[in-house]
Regions:
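N-terminal glycine-rich phosphate-binding loop for ADP-containing cofactors
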Residues: 1-435
Length: 435
């Protein structure tokens, strides 16, 4: 296994950089140089990292630094992890600088959520390109152990195997190997679902829009957090960077589903980036008595309003079945209920299964990885587990052909997709929540 005693995290003042620094310092037991543009911000990030893991002892492993110290930090490090903004020009500049000081045998990696690993490897002198990899962790990494590992054509595959072992055994990551394709595997699947939910919110703005769609796709459908709430949590600017990258660099059968709706761009232009900016698609306010109220952006009116607690009959019945432990009847209710809301929900889940398996076949090296990325990176019911939930009560192929639109049925060989089904190691029942 790799012996990583000293790590440099570049962009350590950001949320991900701070959390990754804590992972290297705690699980990795490494000295970590936390580098950002401003030394004071690095110092504050080190304090936040200690609170993140609730272990003051790791603060002694964290060394705040700024870019003027970057070369010296890199020269000393066994591993350099770049966690800067998801902007290709910024990353090219940083990796060019890192490459000037990287020592022979050290690992260099990017935490990019989907930019080209080959392009970033080419920032390094030829003799160091073999030491560069994509190591995409999910945030927050203490709750989401997924790590997507990606090589480039230049990568030393023996070092790759050692890095995989280190991530797995030392940092306790669930390592998913991905091809060097836009957004890798997890975000390709997850942000297809999330962006389509944003599109549907605009389509159904007369019905309520954002909270209407989130209520249709809540925890009772196999996810911890509804999809539009997830976009708000991730950050609308981050969401935009991911879907724009996929749209510009892919051309699969759901290509247009990666076009971000105009209303989301308008929120970004106003600085309303989501939870980190205290407002975005949702906004929490306190009234004079100190009581908290959740507000939601009304797409039609262009202003915030009180969030509506929708009570769709199909959802009420599904939640009751789930509460009683009757998962089969919960799925039957979803299939047999012909309300608009149940139909939207069902078709989302069927499309999720199809696109997950299609993407795993094209982007991953092992179909099982589709389950790993969605379970450990998103805490969503993974596709093979969801297939099991459906196949227990229906002919899934027939259901897909009957309920999905012709553009999906005609674009994908559904029979082939279903032939890929394998037994999931994940239990679908733990993902469907009675709430």
């Amino acid at each position: 296994m790799l012996k990583i005693k000293t790590v440099t995290v570049v962009g350590a003042n950001g949320t991900m950089g701070t959390n990754v620094s804590a992972i290297f310092a705690s699980f990795g037991d490494a000295k970590v140089y936390m580098v950002s543009r401003d030394l004071e911000k690095s110092k504050m990030a080190a304090q936040r990292a200690g609170k993140t893991v609730k272990a003051d002892s790791i603060v002694n492993h964290l060394v705040p630094a700024d870019y003027s110290m970057l070369a010296e930090c890199v020269k000393e490090s066994d591993l350099v992890f770049e966690s800067a903004a998801e902007n290709l020009d910024i990353k090219i500049d940083l990796h060019t600088r890192i490459g000037q000081s990287l020592k022979k045998g050290a690992v260099a990696c990017t935490g990019s959520s989907g930019l080209s690993i080959q392009r970033l490897a080419e920032c390094y002198p030829e003799e160091f390109r073999q030491q560069f990899y994509g190591v995409h962790m999910f945030n927050p990494p203490y709750q989401l152990p997924l790590c997507e590992l990606t090589a480039s054509p230049y990568s030393d595959m023996e070092l790759y195997k050692e890095l995989k072992e280190y991530l797995d055994q030392k940092l306790h990551r669930c390592v998913a190997e991905s091809k060097d394709l836009p957004a890798f595997l997890g975000n390709r699947i997850g942000f297809y679902f999330i962006n389509e939910a944003l599109i549907y919110a605009e389509r159904y703005q007369d019905n309520g829009g954002i909270d209407y769609i989130d209520s249709i796709l809540g925890p009772f459908t196999g996810r911890t957090m509804p999809p539009i709430t997830t976009a708000d949590f991730v950050g609308l600017d981050v969401h935009k960077a991911i879907v724009d990258n996929i749209y510009e660099n892919t051309n699969d059968y759901v290509h247009e589903k990666f076009v971000m709706p105009k209303y989301v761009q308008e929120l970004i232009d106003k600085g309303m980036l989501g939870r980190k900016a205290k407002q975005g698609l949702y906004k929490m306010i306190k009234n004079d008595s100190g009581e908290k109220r959740m507000m939601v952006w009304d797409i039609k009116d262009g202003q915030f309003r009180d969030e509506i607690k929708y009570n769709f009959p199909f959802a009420i019945r599904m939640k009751q079945y789930l509460k009683d432990g009757d998962y089969d009847d919960a799925v039957r209710e979803l299939i047999n209920n012909r309300s608009q809301e149940a139909d939207i929900c069902l078709r989302f889940l069927l499309r999720y299964i199809i696109y997950s398996l299609w993407t795993a076949e094209h982007v991953g090296y092992d179909l099982r990885v589709a389950d790993d990325v969605m379970a450990t990176g998103f805490t969503w019911c993974p596709p093979f587990a969801m297939m099991e939930a459906f196949t227990r009560v229906c002919d899934l192929g027939k259901l897909m052909k009957e309920r999905l639109r012709p553009e999906i049925v005609n674009a994908v060989d559904i029979d082939h997709i279903l032939s890929l089904q394998i037994k999931s190691k994940y239990d679908y029942r733990i993902y469907f929540k009675a709430k």
